[in-house]
């Protein structure tokens, strides 16, 4: 190939690569926007916020568990990018999913593997208050990607956390 032909092929390759990169960026931004909107909708929900602020929920508040679980199960919160949504309540030391209730140590093990190190990682995760952040953890060759939103979304000590486990292939 002549120099001009190689240059033309290279220019075409660069144009195609740039177009593909733009499409990927748009898709990623749209996906993260949906995930963030779902998390903020949960964080701003009055039922969830009120429950998170109770110092020690009573047995009568257990009905609220089912209400909150149904909110987690709504279609907007189960997009293809999100594998699972956990709603961790500091006051209970428990996390809810659409179907299950986890103790704090069991949740740490599910997210980060068994052992004391997983509890330490979970404690670090819940010590930072944030509107929406994406964090990754790698352990034993497996990478966990989490979108984390605090309730309340500002302040030094969150009373609850929304943890969205993201599909690394998505």
Features from the language model and the residues they span:
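Short alpha-helical interface patches
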Residues: 5, 50-53, 170
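N-terminal membrane-insertion alpha helix
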Residues: 1-22
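Extracytoplasmic/periplasmic sensory segments of membrane signal-transduction proteins
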Residues: 15-22, 27, 31-129
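PAS and PAS-like sensory modules
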Residues: 129-138
């Amino acid at each position: 190939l002549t120099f001009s032909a190689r240059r033309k092929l290279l220019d075409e390759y660069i144009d195609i690569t740039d177009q593909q990169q733009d499409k990927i960026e748009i898709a990623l931004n749209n996906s993260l926007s949906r995930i963030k909107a779902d998390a903020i909708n949960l964080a701003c929900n009055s039922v969830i916020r009120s429950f998170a602020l109770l110092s020690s929920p009573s047995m009568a508040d257990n009905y609220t568990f089912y209400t909150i679980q149904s909110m987690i199960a709504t279609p907007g919160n189960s997009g293809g990018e999100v594998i699972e949504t956990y709603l961790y309540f500091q006051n209970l030391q428990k996390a809810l999913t659409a179907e299950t209730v986890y103790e704090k140590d069991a949740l740490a093990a599910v997210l980060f593997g068994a052992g004391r190190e997983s509890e330490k990682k979970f404690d670090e995760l819940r010590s930072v208050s944030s509107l929406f952040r994406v964090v990754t953890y790698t352990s034993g060759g497996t990478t966990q990607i989490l979108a984390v939103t605090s309730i309340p979304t500002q302040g030094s000590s969150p009373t609850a956390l929304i943890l969205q486990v993201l599909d690394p292939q998505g």
